[in-house]
Amino acid sequence: ITSLGAREEVNQATHRWGGIVFHDVINQKFAHKAIEKGADGLILVAAGAGGHAGVISPFAFVAETRRWFDGPIALSGAIANGRAIRAARLLGADFAYIGSAFIATKEANAVERYKEMITTSGAEDIVYSNLFTGVHGNYLKPSIAASGMDPDNLPQSDASKMSFGTDDSGERVRPKAWKEIWGSGQGIGSLDEVVPAAELIARFKKEYDEAVDPPL
């Protein structure tokens, strides 16, 4: 899985040992570029995805991509229950790409406060900002507030530079993304507690099956 720049040499090296490459993309420009440079599949990071994310509706994103690409597609963006997984498949994606829901599992190595924050927050607790890395992403408002910043009044970062909380000299200039500012998608309103991953997957399967064949 690659992101933030498709690289031919990485794709070629992966193919040499029999691997396949999926590349994160947020729009058609990057999707075309990824395939041109040798990626095998695409991860469509749609509106509502956690961490670095785009703003395109999953309905539009999958439909437009399927007009020219018949390879494997994973769809990302606010997928946190089995019904959403089924919806992704109906849209034309081959896989649902899920992140935030698995942060709130017992096996995840995230700190407990992060897990708890995911299970007590909802879509309105997510803020979309490029301040923390130079690339727009979705973050938990409570984690921003806990770092002493106003999540509703964040300045814009220089979009031409990637930054992870330090200046050119390495000096810390703001709280660091991922370590103190926690990424999350908008689908977390479906999550109420930290559970074992197996329990989460079993719930996904039950919800998916019910969406395919609703109980009478």
Q: What spans do the regions from the language model cover?
A:
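Alpha/beta enzyme core
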Residues: 1-74, 82-100
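Conserved active-site-proximal phosphate/metal-binding subdomains
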Residues: 58-74, 80-216
